UniProtKB/Swiss-Prot annotation:
GO terms for biological process: DNA topological change; sister chromatid segregation. Mg(2+) 1 binds at residues 437, 538. Belongs to the type II topoisomerase family. It comes from African swine fever virus (isolate Tick/Malawi/Lil 20-1/1983) (ASFV). The record marks 798 as: Transition state stabilizer. This is DNA topoisomerase 2. Its EC number is 5.6.2.2. It is an enzyme of class 5 (isomerase). One of its GO terms (cellular component) is host cell cytoplasm. SUPFAM superfamilies: ATPase domain of HSP90 chaperone/DNA topoisomerase II/histidine kinase (SSF55874), Type II DNA topoisomerase (SSF56719). Mg(2+) 2 binds at residues 538, 540. Residues 706-1173 form the Topo IIA-type catalytic domain.
Length: 1191
C-alpha cells in the first residue's frame, strides 16, 4: 500500500518529466526489415504522421509490463509472457505474474468518500503510483506514475482486469475517467494483469473509427515495440503480438530485423558492455553493431529499461570510443597526416542496437524518451571489450578507405596552361595531348603546333592539345596506401596530397581518366578524350630520368593497360647536332652513345661544330620547324615488358632497401644494338628507360646530396672548388657571391638554379663553432651566418663576397694532381673532376648530414692530430707505428686513436659503449636560482636549442625565463628557475652514469651517431662501418696518386729532354744541314729524318696538361719536325744553345730525382707525401690562428 501513496500534486506537477508530448502529429517514416513467425522476410513501412501522445498511450502500457517483468525477475512467481494486441483500434496489453494488490485504499477512499481499491488508484488517480519516487538503483522505465492515467484520460473506454492469486478485479472506466464504474471482485487463483482500451482517436487527429491505412501504420509501430521488448526481456519471457510470438529474443535478432533488407549479408558485431561497480555492474548492456557502406549516417535503436530511447549519454560514450579507435587505426593504415576523419565520418556507416538496464537514470524530453545521467558514469565505470572495438574498427576503416577512393575519383581542380584540341567527340581517338615539361617546353610545343598552317604534314591544334607539367611531378607511388580488407579486396587509397595535386589531377581531367576503370578493352579506351599522351621533356637527367619516369610511374600505378596499348608516348628530340664545315644539314644524335660511336669512326672533329640540346628551349625556330615537319617519326611509344613492374617498384616505391641495392652499381650504357632497335621500332621499353635514364638521375641525385669518400665533397661543392681554382688562379681578389656563382654556373655547367648554388658557396665559406666545415674552401667577407641560427642568418649573395682560401686549398689539392683526375664532361666540355684525392682524408675531417634515396649520411669530424698521426704512420717507414698500422690495415682492425674533433668546442666528449657523446657546460648559482649554460653540445644552434627546451612542458614547469646573451663565438644562456625548483629538478631528472641531473634537464648531451654512407669513385654507394674503414679505403687512392704523378712527370721529362737534345744537336749541325736551301718543308723534313732526328708532337710535349701517360707515349713521337723548322735565327745563337743545355741538365737532374722517388720505400713518392702533409698542417695552423684570413 505504501507504493501507492498519494503525493502532493503541486510538487508532482513541478517535474519536467510530467509532460508526455504534443497532441498534434509529427512525421514518422522509415523502412524496417522484420521476421515473420516462419522467418519469411517482410517489409513494414511506417510513413504516416502520428500523434506522440497516442504513441505514448501504447508505449506506457508496454513499459509498465516490462517494468513488472523486471520487478518479478528475482521472485518465485515470474512473468512468463506479455501479450500485446491491436485490432480495430482496440489496444490491449496483458502479462502474467503477480497482479495489482486487490485491497481497499484507505486514503483514497477517505478523499473520494467511497470505497476505492488499489487497482483504481494505480490507473485513475494522478497523485499515486509505484514510479513517483525511485531509488538510485531502480531500473524501471516508468516515470512519475503518469503513464496509465494518461492512457485513461485519452480513452473512450478502458477495462482493467487484474488477479492477485486470491481475487479477480474487473473495472470499467468510460468517457475519459468521467465515469468510473464500481469494480467486480470475484474469487480467483489466477495471477495476471490486463488493460484494454479504445483511445479517443478523433481528438488526436485520427479517424474514428481508424481507417485501414491508420490501422496498418499503428499496428506496424506496435509490432516494432513488441519486438524491441522481446529483445529487452530476453528468452525467459515470451512477447506475443496478436497471439504470435516475436522472434527477436536477443540483441542480434533485433539488429537483423532492422538491417536485413537495407544491408543484407552484413556482419553483426555483438558484445556486452560491463561496469566495474554496483549498481551498474549488475546490469551489462548488450550491443549489436552492423557496419555497412549502405548506411549513410549513424543510427541506433536503444532499448534501455524497456523504453525506446532516442538519445542518451550511453550512445555518446559508444560513439566517442569507436571514433577514437577508428581515427587511430585510420591514421596508422593510411599514413597520411593531411587526411583526417571526424566523428561523423567514423560512425556514419554504423547501425547500433543497445539493449539493457541502467540504474538511476532520468527520462527527459517531451515524450520521456531521452536518457539523462552524469556523463562521467560511463567514462568511469563502463568499458567496451577491445575485441569488439578492434573488429568494428577494421570494418569501419575498410569502408572509409573505399569511400575515399571513390570520392577522390571525382576530385575537380582548375587546369592551368591547357589548350584543348579543336577536334573532339567522335574524333577524340585521333587526337593527342602533348604534355610539356615546363613553360619553356610548352613554348616549343606551341611554336611547333602553330606551324601547322605552313606545314600541312605536321601536327596542329586541330588534333593536338597541350598541357604543362609544371616542371615537376609528384611521385604518386609514395602517395598511395595499398590496404587489404577483411574480404581480401585490395584498396589503393590516394592520400590528400595526391588528390589535391593540380598537375596530376589536371591530366586526369583533361584525358577523362577514371581511377575505377582498367582500360583493358577498346570500348573503355574509346571513352577517353584523347587517343594518346605525348611527353615533351628536356633531354637532361631531370627531364628524362625524373619527370618522364614519374609520369610513366603514374600511369603504370593506376592504368598499366594504357601503357600496354601504346597510349603513353614521348617526343624524342635530338640531343646532339653536329654541323660539318660547309654543310647546312646537321647529323643528329638522340643518345650520347650514338654520338660516341660515330665520333670514334671520324679521323678528326676539327671541322665539325658539336652542339648539345639538353633543354627543349635550346632549339631555334628553324630547328623546331624541322622537328615538327617530321613529327610522326619523332614520337616513340613506351612498351611494358615483364621486368618493368619490379623496376617501377624499385625506383619509385617506398622500399628504400630495394632501391639502395640497385643503386650500389652504376648505369650500364645503351649498346649500339639497343639504340638501333629503339629507332627502327620507334618503341622504348619501360624497363630500358628505367635502367638507363631513371637510374642515371637517381645516381646523379645521390652525388648531389652525398659526398664521395675520396674528397668528402658533393658534386655542387666540387664544382664550386673547381670553379674557384680556375676563377681565382690569376687574381685572388674578392668577388661577390652571386658573381662567383655565375662564373661557376657558366664554366662548371651547374644546372640546378642560382639559389642553391649561392647557398652552397656561402656554406663553403662558413666558419663558426658548429659549422659543417672546419676547413673552409673560401674566405668569407661579410656576414656569412652565425652559430645563433646555424648559418641561416647569412647575408644576401649580392652583398657578401668570397675569395679562395688559397694557402690551404693549394696545399690540400696540389696542382700537379689535376692532370691525373677523371673529369666530368658537360655539353662536350670538360667541367669539374669526378672526384679529388686531397693530401689528407677530408671526408673524415668535417661534419655533414644529409639523406638521399634511402641512405643517411652523417659524419662527425675526427681530430686533426689523430688523422695526421695515422697518415704519417702509414707513409713514413721510419715511424715507430708504421709496421703496426700496416698490420692493422691488412687485418682491418684499429690500433691508433681516431677521436671526434673538439676544435672550437668548449664542452666535453665522452665515450660510452660504441658511441661518443658531446656535452655542453653549465654553471649553477643556487643563490640567484639561475643556471648559466656556457656551451652547447656539438653542432646545436642556439635558437634551435632554446626552442626545443621551450617546447618541453615538463622542463618549462621548472623554468621561469630563458635569456640568451650568446654571441657568434660564445654561449651564454641564462635559465632562471622558479622558486625551490633546483632540488625538485635533481629528484625528477635522475642522474645516470652517462649524464648528471642538470645535463638531463637541460638536454646538454647529444650522441655522435654516424651513418657512414659515401659515393664510390665509379658511382653507387659504399657503406662504411667505421671512420677507420674510410681512412683505410682512402689511403691507397692517395698513395697511387704519387706513383701516377711521378710516372707522368718522368714521361714528360723524357720527352722534353729528347726534344731539347734534338734541338741542340740541330743547332750544332745546322750549318752542315743547310735546310734553307730546300724548297719546301716536306723536303726539309725528309733530310731531318734521314739524319736521325725524331719527329715529335711539340704541342703535346710542351703542354701535356690532361694527356695520360699512354697518350704521351703513343702520340708524342708521332709528330713532325715543326719544333725544329719553326726555330728562329736568334734561337740558333750560342747563348740560346747554352741556355738549352742548362735546361737539359736541370731536367735530367729532376728526372734522376723522379727515378729515385719512384724507387722509394714503402711506396713511390712517400717522401713527397710527407712534405705535402707538413705543408697542409702549416696552412691549417696559420688558417686557424688568423680565422682563415692568412694575414
Amino acid at each position: 500500500m505504501e507504493a501507492f501513496e498519494i503525493s502532493d500534486f503541486k510538487e508532482h506537477a513541478k517535474k519536467k518529466s510530467m509532460w508526455a508530448g504534443a497532441l498534434n502529429k509529427v512525421t514518422i517514416s522509415g523502412l524496417m526489415g522484420v521476421f515473420t513467425e516462419d522467418e519469411d522476410l517482410m517489409a513494414l513501412p511506417i510513413h504516416r504522421d502520428h500523434c506522440p501522445a497516442l504513441l505514448k498511450i501504447f508505449d506506457e502500457l508496454i513499459v509498465n509490463a516490462t517494468d513488472h517483468e523486471r520487478a518479478c525477475h528475482s521472485k518465485t512467481k515470474k512473468v512468463t509472457y506479455i501479450k500485446i494486441s491491436f485490432d480495430k483500434g482496440v489496444f490491449a496489453c496483458e502479462n502474467d505474474g503477480p497482479g495489482i494488490p486487490i485491497a481497499k485504499h484507505e486514503q483514497a477512499s477517505l478523499i473520494a468518500k467511497r470505497d476505492v481499491y488499489v487497482p483504481e488508484v494505480a490507473s485513475c488517480h494522478f497523485l499515486a503510483g509505484t514510479n513517483i519516487n525511485k531509488a538510485k538503483d531502480c531500473i524501471k522505465g516508468g516515470t512519475n506514475g503518469v503513464g496509465l492515467k494518461l492512457a485513461m484520460v485519452h480513452s473512450q473506454w478502458a477495462i482493467l482486469t487484474t488477479a492477485d492469486g486470491a481475487q479477480k478485479y474487473v473495472q470499467h472506466i468510460n468517457q475519459r475517467l468521467d465515469i468510473i464504474e464500481p469494480p467486480t471482485i470475484t474469487p480467483s487463483r489466477e495471477m495476471f494483469t490486463r488493460i484494454e482500451l479504445m483511445p479517443v482517436y478523433q481528438e488526436l487527429g485520427y479517424a474514428q473509427p481508424l481507417s485501414e491505412t491508420e490501422q496498418a501504420d499503428l499496428s506496424a509501430w506496435i509490432y516494432l515495440r513488441a519486438c524491441q521488448c522481446a529483445a529487452y526481456v530476453g528468452k525467459g519471457t515470451t512477447i506475443y503480438y496478436n497471439d504470435k510470438p516475436c522472434n527477436t529474443g536477443s540483441v542480434m535478432a533485433l539488429a537483423k530485423m532492422y538491417t536485413l533488407l537495407s544491408a543484407p549479408n552484413s556482419t553483426i558485431h555483438t558484445t556486452a558492455i560491463k561496469a566495474d561497480a554496483k549498481p551498474y555492474s549488475l546490469h551489462p548492456l548488450q550491443v549489436a553493431a552492423v557496419v555497412s557502406p549502405k548506411f549513410k549516417k549513424f543510427e541506433h535503436v536503444s532499448i534501455i529499461n524497456g523504453v525506446n530511447c532516442v538519445k542518451g549519454e550511453h550512445v555518446t560514450f559508444l560513439k566517442k570510443t569507436i571514433n577514437e579507435m577508428v581515427v587511430k587505426k585510420f591514421q596508422q593504415t593510411i599514413k597520411d597526416k593531411n587526411r583526417k576523419t571526424t566523428l561523423r565520418d567514423s560512425c556514419s556507416n554504423i547501425f547500433v542496437v543497445i539493449v539493457g538496464s541502467i540504474p538511476g537514470i532520468e527520462w527527459t524530453g517531451q515524450r520521456k524518451d531521452e536518457l539523462s545521467i552524469a556523463e562521467n558514469v560511463f567514462k568511469t565505470h563502463y568499458s567496451i571489450p577491445s575485441s569488439f572495438l578492434t573488429n568494428m574498427t577494421r570494418s569501419i576503416v575498410d569502408i572509409l578507405l573505399q569511400s575515399i577512393s571513390k570520392k577522390d575519383n571525382h576530385k575537380q581542380v582548375d587546369v592551368d596552361k591547357y589548350t584543348r584540341a579543336n577536334a573532339g567527340g567522335k574524333k577524340a581517338q585521333d587526337c593527342m595531348l602533348l604534355a610539356a615539361e615546363g613553360d619553356s617546353a610548352l613554348s616549343l610545343v606551341r611554336a611547333g603546333l602553330t606551324l601547322g598552317k605552313s606545314n600541312p604534314s605536321g601536327p596542329s591544334f586541330d588534333f593536338c592539345g597541350m598541357i604543362s607539367l609544371g616542371g615537376v611531378i609528384m611521385n604518386a607511388c609514395k602517395k598511395v596506401t595499398n590496404i587489404t580488407t577483411d574480404s581480401g579486396e585490395t584498396i589503393m587509397v590516394r592520400n590528400e596530397q595526391l588528390t589535391n595535386n593540380k598537375v596530376l589531377q589536371g591530366i586526369v581531367q583533361v584525358l577523362g581518366l577514371d581511377f575505377n576503370c582498367h582500360y583493358k578493352t577498346q570500348e573503355e579506351r574509346a571513352k577517353l578524350r584523347y587517343g594518346c599522351i605525348v611527353a615533351c621533356v628536356d633531354q637532361d637527367l631531370d627531364g628524362c630520368g625524373k619527370i618522364l619516369g614519374l609520369l610513366l610511374a603514374y600511369f603504370h600505378l593506376f592504368w598499366p593497360q594504357l601503357i600496354i596499348h601504346g597510349f603513353v608516348k614521348r617526343l624524342l628530340t635530338p640531343l646532339i647536332r653536329v654541323y660539318e664545315k660547309g654543310k647546312t644539314v646537321p647529323v643528329e644524335f638522340y643518345y650520347e652513345q650514338e654520338f660516341d660511336a660515330w665520333a670514334k669512326k671520324q679521323t678528326s672533329l676539327a671541322n665539325h661544330t658539336v652542339k648539345y640540346y639538353k633543354g627543349l628551349a635550346a632549339h631555334d625556330t628553324h630547328e623546331v620547324k624541322s622537328m615538327f615537319k617530321h613529327f610522326d617519326n619523332m614520337v616513340y611509344t613506351f612498351t611494358l615488358d615483364d621486368s618493368a613492374k619490379e623496376l617501377f617498384h624499385i625506383y619509385f616505391g617506398g622500399e628504400s632497401e630495394l632501391r639502395k641495392r640497385e643503386l650500389c652499381t652504376g648505369v650500364v650504357p645503351l649498346t649500339e644494338t639497343q639504340t638501333q632497335s629503339i629507332h627502327s621500332d620507334r618503341q622504348i621499353p619501360c624497363s630500358l628507360h628505367l635502367q638507363v635514364d631513371t637510374k642515371a638521375y637517381k645516381l646523379d641525385a645521390i652525388e648531389r646530396q652525398i659526398p664521395n669518400f675520396l674528397d668528402g665533397m658533393t658534386r655542387a661543392r666540387r664544382k664550386i672548388l673547381a670553379g674557384g681554382l680556375k676563377c681565382f688562379a690569376s687574381n685572388n681578389r674578392e668577388r661577390k657571391v652571386f658573381q662567383f656563382g655565375g662564373y661557376v654556373a657558366d664554366h662548371m655547367f651547374y644546372h640546378h638554379g642560382d639559389m642553391s648554388l649561392n647557398t652552397s658557396i656561402i656554406k663553403a665559406a662558413q666558419y663558426y663553432p658548429g659549422s659543417s666545415h672546419l676547413y673552409p674552401v673560401f674566405i668569407g667577407i661579410g656576414s656569412f651566418g652565425s652559430r645563433h641560427l646555424g648559418g641561416k642568418d647569412a647575408g644576401s649573395p649580392r652583398y657578401i663576397s668570397v675569395q679562395l682560401a688559397s694557402e690551404f686549398i693549394k696545399t690540400m689539392f696540389p696542382a700537379e694532381d689535376s692532370w691525373l683526375l677523371p673529369y666530368v664532361f658537360e655539353d662536350g666540355q670538360r667541367a669539374e673532376p669526378e672526384y679529388y684525392v686531397p693530401v689528407l682524408p677530408l671526408a673524415i675531417m668535417e661534419y655533414g648530414a644529409n639523406p638521399s634515396e634511402g641512405w643517411k649520411y652523417t659524419t662527425w669530424a675526427r681530430q686533426l692530430e689523430d688523422i695526421l698521426a695515422l697518415v704519417r704512420a702509414y707513409v713514413d717507414k721510419n715511424n715507430p707505428k708504421h709496421e703496426l698500422l700496416h698490420y692493422a690495415i691488412e687485418r682491418k682492425i684499429t690500433v691508433l686513436p681516431l677521436r671526434p674533433s673538439n676544435y672550437n668546442f668548449k664542452g666535453h666528449l665522452k665515450r660510452f659503449g660504441q658511441y661518443y657523446y658531446s656535452y655542453g657546460t653549465y654553471v649553477v648559482s643556487e643563490q640567484r636560482n639561475i643556471i648559466t649554460i656556457t656551451e652547447l653540445p656539438l653542432r646545436v644552434p642556439t635558437v634551435a636549442y632554446i626552442e626545443s627546451i621551450k617546447k618541453s612542458s615538463n622542463r618549462m614547469a621548472f623554468i621561469e625565463e630563458i635569456i640568451d646573451y650568446s654571441s657568434s663565438e660564445t654561449i651564454e644562456i641564462l635559465v632562471k628557475l622558479k622558486p625551490n625548483s633546483l632540488n625538485r629538478i635533481v629528484e625528477e631528472f635522475k642522474e645516470t652514469e652517462e649524464q648528471d641531473s642538470i645535463e638531463n634537464f637541460l638536454r646538454l648531451r647529444n650522441c655522435l651517431h654516424s651513418h657512414l654512407n659515401f659515393v664510390k669513385p665509379k658511382g653507387g654507394i659504399i657503406e662504411f662501418n667505421s671512420y677507420y674503414e674510410i681512412l683505410y679505403a682512402w689511403l691507397p687512392y692517395r698513395r697511387d696518386v704519387y706513383q701516377k704523378r711521378l710516372m707522368r712527370e718522368r714521361a714528360v721529362l723524357k720527352l722534353r729532354i729528347i726534344m731539347e737534345t734534338a734541338i741542340v744537336r740541330y743547332i750544332n749541325e745546322s750549318a752542315d744541314l743547310n735546310l734553307s736551301h730546300y724548297e719546301d718543308e716536306k723536303e726539309a723534313s725528309r733530310i731531318l729524318s734521314e739524319h736521325g732526328f725524331p719527329p715529335l708532337n711539340q704541342s703535346l710535349i710542351t703542354s701535356p696538361e690532361f694527356a695520360s701517360i699512354e697518350e704521351l707515349n703513343q702520340k708524342a713521337l708521332q709528330g713532325c719536325y715543326t719544333y725544329i723548322l719553326s726555330l728562329q735565327a736568334r734561337e740558333l745563337l750560342i747563348a740560346a744553345k747554352t741556355r738549352r743545355v742548362e735546361k737539359i741538365k736541370k731536367m735530367q737532374a729532376r728526372l734522376d730525382k723522379v727515378e729515385q722517388l719512384l724507387q722509394e720505400s714503402p711506396f713511390p713518392g712517400a717522401s713527397v707525401w710527407l712534405e705535402e702533409i707538413d705543408a697542409v698542417e702549416k696552412a691549417i695552423i696559420k688558417g686557424r690562428s688568423t680565422q682563415w684570413k692568412f694575414h
